Amino acid sequence: MLAKVEPKRQLARFRGRSYVAFVFAPVVPIADWLEEIDSTIERSSGFFVGRPVVLDLSAVDLSCSGITHLLSSLEARNIRVLGIEGVNGSQLTPSMPPLLTGGRHCVLEHIETDKAEAKPRASSLLLKQPVRSGQSVVFTEGDVTVLGSVGSGAEIVAGGSIHIYGTLRGRAMAGVNGNLDARIYCQKIEAELLAIDGYYQTAENIDSTLRSRPVQAWLDDETLKITPLI
């Protein structure tokens, strides 16, 4: 049995390395886009709470006053904007969140080091204890394996795949560095959220027939698919 979530335009995506942020990319009409946010909040009131947001304005043409109004609209919904991208810096005022860029170019000097001192970077993380409510585990170098359960309100963020040998009640976000082949496996799904490379589904969207069953999730184009593990 395959539980397929019908493709639709994503309201937001995730982006993250040392942290995970929502990337909001508004489209016109802005009022309709805000209604989508309201619908998400209505289904899950805490979905955006405490999560930093990057506002990508590359798809809209807003004046300074328009950006101000949009920021106020998001703030009224308890959504915290960490930074803005996709606009000219002259469109922003000092009171707005900072303009995010790709960073400055730099020249790296090669420094000879003792090869014996070099240690290979771990490509996986093994957690032998349960991840309790409120805890956040971020490992962007590779896979994360949890031998226990992941509690409600807890969060696992991985650059690779996520393997949970227990119940997943919190959030699991795999492939956060753009790994389209990442997967999520768990022995019992009661998740608040599943995400791969930024494409996500919340508890309300996951097929109810899969609840409390062992499953795997993967990304097919821009559609998150979930199937039972037999």
Swiss-Prot record:
Can the keyword Cell division be found in this entry's annotation? Answer: yes
Could you list the residue ranges that cross the membrane? none
Q: Which Gene3D superfamilies match?
A: 2.160.20.70, 3.30.70.260
State the UniProt keywords alphabetically.
Cell cycle, Cell division, Septation
Q: Which InterPro entries match?
A: CAP/MinC_C (IPR016098), MinC (IPR013033), MinC_C_sf (IPR036145), Septum_form_inhib_MinC_C (IPR005526)
User: Which GO annotations describe the biological process of this protein?
Assistant: cell morphogenesis; division septum assembly; regulation of cell septum assembly
Looking up Pfam families in the UniProt record yields: MinC_C
> Whom does it interact with, and what assembly results?
Interacts with MinD and FtsZ.
Function, in words = Cell division inhibitor that blocks the formation of polar Z ring septums. Rapidly oscillates between the poles of the cell to destabilize FtsZ filaments that have formed before they mature into polar Z rings. Prevents FtsZ polymerization.
Describe the family membership recorded for this protein in Swiss-Prot or TrEMBL.
Answer: Belongs to the MinC family.
Q: Under which name does UniProt file this protein? A: Probable septum site-determining protein MinC
Q: Which gene encodes it?
A: minC
